[in-house]
Structures are given as C-alpha cells and as structure tokens.
From Swiss-Prot:
EC number in record: 4.6.1.12
GO molecular function, one term: 2-C-methyl-D-erythritol 2,4-cyclodiphosphate synthase activity
Signal peptide: none
Cofactor(s) annotated in UniProt: a divalent metal cation
Cofactor binding: number and manner: Binds 1 divalent metal cation per subunit.
Protein name per Swiss-Prot or TrEMBL: 2-C-methyl-D-erythritol 2,4-cyclodiphosphate synthase
Residues that, per the record, bind 4-CDP-2-C-methyl-D-erythritol 2-phosphate: D9, V10, H11, H35, S36, D57, I58, G59, F140, R143
Residue positions binding a divalent metal cation: D9, H11, H43
Length: 157
C-alpha cells in the first residue's frame, strides 16, 4: 500500500541567526527565526512524512513550548521521524521538495542537503529531490522577508 503526504512551512528572516536549510549552513546576511534551528525545508519534509503516516504534524510531535527542542538541529527531529517510520514498517519511496527564496540561491547546496537528509532517513540521496525557486520578487519571499518550503513524500508499507 502506498501513502502520499504533503508538507508546507514558512519562517521569517531575522538578523543575527545562521541560515540552515536542509541541514546545511548557507552563508547569508541573515537567518530564519524559530524555536529550533528554523530549518524550513526539513520542517516541510517532516510534515510531509507525518502526513503520509497519518500522524498529525511537527508542532504536535515536537512542541514549541518544550525546552528540549530549543535551537535543536531539525535533522535530529528528522531522525526521530525516521524511527517512527521504522516502528511502523513504512519505507520512503521518494521525497520531492521546493524551497522558495528570492535570495539566497540554493542550487549550489542541494547535493549536500540531499545527502544529509538521506543519511538521517537511511535512504539513498537519489530518493530525495530539492528544487529552488524565486517568486520573481513577488510576495514575502520576493521581498526577502522569509522563506517557504513545500514537500511531498510517497511511502509504502
Ligand atoms: O526561471 P523560473 O522562473 O522557472 O525559475 P526562477 O525562480 O527564476 O529560478 C531559476 C533557477 O534558479 C531555478 O531553476 C534554480 O535552479 C535556481 N534557484 C535556486 O537555486 N534557489 C532559489 N532560491 C531560487 C532559484
Ligand atoms: Zn518550521
């Protein structure tokens, strides 16, 4: 049996934080605000996986109110989700995702992101796809106020 899931996330830019996307630190003049490392791509992927599993969402599994998750690497959360998948005997077929940011361009970093995400999920990096997209200056991403990310995942059981 196959199950599909969708994930979406947004974080706003702030001064004085590192920019972490797909577990990779990207040199940029500002970072994303959030309780964890605010890795908007990994959060969208986690929500897509949880969606496919029928397991609510990232905020319910890892509450903002918990000090355990303050400034935590979102890759740690992704590994937790990988454990849940294993417990349920579910396997990821593939992940596709889009990061929407006017700047920075992410394509120089997507191979490293794919490797990190695949490692956490114990899958091949060829099962993970990451695309970058601008909005041609339109909307909050275009004004460089924040970054959004979309992900879909197919899992089989
Ligand atoms: O040309 P089109 O409108 O389809 O795409 P775009 O948003 O102008 O982006 C052009 C190319 O830049 C994309 O195909 C990506 O390869 C790259 N890109 C990126 O790496 N990171 C982003 N945040 C946005 C775009
Ligand atoms: Zn998030």
């Amino acid at each position: 049996m196959f199950k599909v899931g969708i994930g979406y996330d947004v974080h706003r830019f702030v001064e004085g934080r590192k920019l972490i996307l797909g577990g990779v630190e990207i040199p940029f003049e500002k970072g994303l605000l959030g309780h964890s490392d605010a890795d908007v791509l990994v959060h969208a992927i986690i929500d897509a996986i949880l969606g496919a599993m029928g397991e609510n969402d990232i905020g319910r599994l890892f509450p903002d109110s918990s000090p355990n998750y303050k400034d935590i690497s979102s890759l740690v959360l992704l590994k937790e989700v990988a454990k849940l998948l294993e417990e349920k005997n579910m396997k990821i077929v593939n992940i596709d995702s889009t990061v929407v940011s006017q700047r920075p361009k992410i394509s120089p970093y997507t191979n490293e992101m794919k490797n990190k995400i695949a490692d956490c999920l114990k899958i091949e990096s060829t099962q993970v796809n990451i695309k970058g997209k601008t909005t041609e200056g339109l909307g909050f991403e275009g004004r460089e106020e924040g970054i959004s990310a979309y992900a879909v995942v197919l899992i089989c059981e």
